[in-house]
A protein has these predicted regions:
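Helix-rich interaction surfaces within compact, conserved domain-sized segments
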Residues: 23-34, 138-208
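N-terminal post-signal-peptidase region of extra-cytosolic proteins
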Residues: 66-67, 84-99
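Mid-length scaffold segments of soluble, non-membrane domains
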Residues: 94-147
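Sec-dependent signal peptide cleavage junction
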Residues: 19-74
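A short, Trp-centered hydrophobic/proline-enriched beta-strand micro-motif
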Residues: 73-88
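Residue-level detector of beta-strand structural context in well-folded domains
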Residues: 71, 102, 164-166
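Short hydrophobic/aromatic-rich beta-strand segments that constitute the beta-sheet cores
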Residues: 82, 111-115, 175-179
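Bacterial Sec-dependent N-terminal signal peptides
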Residues: 1-29
Length: 208
């Protein structure tokens, strides 16, 4: 009788253990499933971020292309303004400036060069710098194999006699202009963007 009772207890224990194993997943299986789910979530987020970056890059490239075409057309029409937000002096000193008051503007045979700094005095142009106006001659445009546009010209007038070199790279309206005075070595470089005249919002001070 005792042996029968012990046998029944053993059988019941085996049945209970089997039932528990069938109805509850093991911790290892749970962790594996959770890990795979997390991995899929992370991979999904990375894929979305990559797709978003690609979309943003493509949109920016389209915008840059439009701006570049506008700038190139304006340069060919000799009707543009380079609005600068940085001025680099002869020995590499840099001044960050307001693009509304620092520019080189060309309108057919006339050019205006203006610089204005954040200083406590008005200067000759009344806004902290100098504004000069002159006639354009020797206007030339060259585009190399890489699509870089180089514009060269001479500007002569009251207070200015200089060679001007403008460089604009393929696919962007970002540009720089080097101003090389004919009677001194005080070279000046302005970095900014080229805009058609009708889109430029510069403020002109008093000319010399």
């Amino acid at each position: 009788m005792k042996k029968i009772f012990l046998s029944l207890l053993l059988i019941m224990s085996m049945i209970t253990s089997f039932s528990y194993a069938q109805s509850n997943p093991s911790d290892d299986m749970y962790q594996i499933t959770k890990s795979k789910a997390n991995e899929q979530l992370v991979n999904g987020l990375k894929a979305r971020q990559k797709a978003l970056k690609n979309e943003q890059r493509a949109l920016q490239n389209r915008i840059d292309s439009v701006l570049w075409n506008e700038a190139l057309t304006a340069v060919k029409d000799t009707a543009f303004t380079l609005e600068a937000d940085k001025v680099v002096f002869k020995y590499g000193q840099i001044a960050y400036v307001n693009s509304n008051t620092n520019f080189v503007s060309v309108n057919k045979d006339n050019a205006i060069v203006q610089v204005a700094f954040n200083v406590p005095f008005a200067g000759p142009n009344g806004i902290g710098g100098v504004t000069v106006q002159g006639s354009v001659s020797g206007y030339k445009i060259q585009i190399d194999k890489k699509g870089t546009t180089l514009v060269t010209m001479n500007v002569t007038g009251v207070g200015i006699s200089a060679q001007i070199w403008i460089t604009m790279y393929q696919g962007t309206h970002d540009a720089n202009v080097e101003i090389l005075p004919n009677f001194s070595s005080e070279r000046l470089t302005l970095n900014g963007v080229i805009l058609p005249l009708h889109k430029s919002t510069v403020y002109q001070g008093r000319t010399l």
